[in-house]
From Swiss-Prot:
<comment type="similarity">
    <text>Belongs to the vitamin-B12 independent methionine synthase family.</text>
</comment>
<protein>
    <recommendedName>
        <fullName>5-methyltetrahydropteroyltriglutamate--homocysteine methyltransferase 1</fullName>
        <ecNumber>2.1.1.14</ecNumber>
    </recommendedName>
</protein>
<dbReference type="GO" id="GO:0032259">
    <property type="term" value="P:methylation"/>
</dbReference>
<keyword id="KW-0479">Metal-binding</keyword>
<keyword id="KW-0489">Methyltransferase</keyword>
<dbReference type="GO" id="GO:0008270">
    <property type="term" value="F:zinc ion binding"/>
</dbReference>
<feature type="binding site">
    <location>
        <position position="491"/>
    </location>
    <ligand>
        <name>L-homocysteine</name>
    </ligand>
</feature>
<feature type="binding site">
    <location>
        <begin position="438"/>
        <end position="440"/>
    </location>
    <ligand>
        <name>L-homocysteine</name>
    </ligand>
</feature>
<dbReference type="InterPro" id="IPR013215">
    <property type="entry name" value="Cbl-indep_Met_Synth_N"/>
</dbReference>
<dbReference type="InterPro" id="IPR038071">
    <property type="entry name" value="UROD/MetE-like_sf"/>
</dbReference>
<feature type="binding site">
    <location>
        <position position="606"/>
    </location>
    <ligand>
        <name>L-homocysteine</name>
    </ligand>
</feature>
<feature type="binding site">
    <location>
        <position position="519"/>
    </location>
    <ligand>
        <name>5-methyltetrahydropteroyltri-L-glutamate</name>
    </ligand>
</feature>
<dbReference type="GO" id="GO:0009086">
    <property type="term" value="P:methionine biosynthetic process"/>
</dbReference>
<comment type="function">
    <text>Catalyzes the transfer of a methyl group from 5-methyltetrahydrofolate to homocysteine resulting in methionine formation.</text>
</comment>
<dbReference type="InterPro" id="IPR002629">
    <property type="entry name" value="Met_Synth_C/arc"/>
</dbReference>
<feature type="binding site">
    <location>
        <begin position="522"/>
        <end position="523"/>
    </location>
    <ligand>
        <name>5-methyltetrahydropteroyltri-L-glutamate</name>
    </ligand>
</feature>
<feature type="binding site">
    <location>
        <position position="606"/>
    </location>
    <ligand>
        <name>L-methionine</name>
    </ligand>
</feature>
Amino acid sequence: MASHIVGYPRMGPKRELKFALESFWDGKSSAEDLEKVATDLRASIWKQMADAGIKYIPSNTFSYYDQVLDTAAMLGAVPERYSWTGGEIGFSTYFSMARGNATVPAMEMTKWFDTNYHFIVPELGPNTKFSYSSHKAVNEYKEAKALGVDTVPVLVGPVSYLLLSKPAKGVEKSFALLSLLSSILPVYKEVIAELKAAGATWIQFDEPTLVLDLDSHQLAAFSAAYTELESALSGLNVLIETYFADIPAESYKTLTSLNSVTAYGFDLIRGAKTLDLIKSAGFPSGKYLFAGVVDGRNIWADDLAASLTTLESLEAIVGKDKLVVSTSCSLMHTAVDLVNETKLDSEIKSWLAFAAQKVVEVNALAKALAGQKDEAYFAANAAAQASRRSSPRVTNEEVQKAAAALKGSDHRRATNVSARLDAQQKKLNLPVLPTTTIGSFPQTVELRRVRREYKAKKISEEEYISAIKEEISKVVKIQEELDIDVLVHGEPERNDMVEYFGEQLSGFAFTANGWVQSYGSRCVKPPIIYGDVSRPNPMTVFWSKLAQSMTSRPMKGMLTGPVTILNWSFVRNDQPRFETCYQIALAIKKEVEDLEAGGIQVIQIDEAALREGLPLRKAEHAFYLDWAVHSFRITNCGVQDTTQIHTHMCYSNFNDIIHSIINMDADVITIENSRSDEKLLSVFREGVKYGAGIGPGVYDIHSPRIPSTEEIADRVNKMLAVLDTNILWVNPDCGLKTRKYNEVKPALTNMVSAAKLIRTQLASAK
């Protein structure tokens, strides 16, 4: 019985690649130094899988930045602005495409399906010339072979590559990207020929777009592509790998009818209906099924007994020698190795498996199917599963009851938004076009040092409070000097907008090295939600009250919303996600009510990640949006009309969920908008009625560039063309945490000046 891993984390157990990349980008190390770190990482990963007994070990899943960018490099699809003149693509061109350089901007980055990983979006058009320009896939196959490891080279499939691309600047938005199929397939044929010549016997094409809602034209492209590649692929075993959702019946039909394909990989964790499809529609005889039964997107130990039952039912359909045990997707979406978690509670640790442990699980399942079951390993796993099911740390009956009572009720504030805004204005007395910021202010080296030393118990609580108090006082003073209307305390006490709350809620655990790649060298360390969530004590009230006592202007209380906490964590898999979300919402509700009782009149509940959690298939959108929006409303349904509830959302694509945003019933919403002005404003231009306050970001905080007063005023005027004067707010598009004060002060000065300039113009026009 064979085993397979779809892909593996690239960063290394201690983020070795991250530090090597950043050192190279900063000019502190050479290309050779970077390549040495990468070579060592690849070798250790291949050795680890070979030692674990994995039969089908992937190669070319390593990347210096992103696998879609690697594919663009392989195809020589370099946008003109990078002045590439041909030949093998080196680091200079590659990293310019990923990150931009002094003279040209980077390519766009967007989320990889519904994960928290981001890929570089290829820019294509009718004049894009393709040529074989990066031999990475072949080189890495040969590299592994020289180490005595025969691997399965992995390529992003040609159809998914095109479907994930976008028309380049200046190309019609309606340009048919799939029309380029005949132009890219010759390059794929060259790569395949080289891999065959190097001795490859298997090849894996990742075609995850097969799980999306595809039309007949798009499905026909799959048939056309793999029919065209048929002769090039002859003599090779070909695996088409899909992941992240159920495969629709039509896509399954298309996929299983491809002659050139030997094997199909399915995600059986997020794709439970695919199991039914295999059973009802049948499976082509003589073909391999790579069954993704070990979750590549979470950190929970697999329930081996349950997986074995699933595999045995599949074995009866596809045959013993044609079933391969696999992961549901690449393991790059989970943490690297549990061995590095020396401080994690031992009971919780027994419930977990990171990438290295999942490799062992896959092999244990394959051996069990082959009649070589490791009884001790399975018994330990069963004991851990039982402990997790019965542990009193997981279940809090009071929380369970409170969350169950939420179902079926609506949780809306009693008064409509226009009446609430009137009541709030009487109390807050804000000018037209009120100014505010999103929450965080720059986090200096000194500030990070204070937090680090307090955590390590190197400074006392008194010293810590004194240092944070001083920082808040500085931030309040700056905002008053700038004449901002609604202030923030700057969040100097917070390391991360999710971790800060998770550390104070029950049901959360934290890792020391549970890093997951987000994009390029950037990694995130998601908290683990292992049990019922509750709030033992107030979390932010002390700091918010302190900040409000320093000013007569309104001070915003700052909270992270339940959907964002959920979407940016590793979530328990023993109950539906919405139940966990409702529990978090109830905890945040208590905090909102305590802030209000403490005299905080404006409370912001960030839902930066609400859009991110949207399922891949349209049929599932309504259910998700219903519970996500309901969770937000739960947090603030009990406040008075005079308390103003703000929310903040990130990323651009709101047009398809605008009605859900309105349904959140916030008093004011601020939106990250500066990179996609027209996209957002077009919604309102098309007649969507929005009655609450709204603050589309007037400048991009992700850039060090300082916008002029005129530029911001021009942007505000464009907004006023489609939005009422009395609902528009003026604010940056995101928090200022990553910027420096010498960038923040002039940018905010110009922002306030622009608001005042337009107020004057509006007053004189009356």
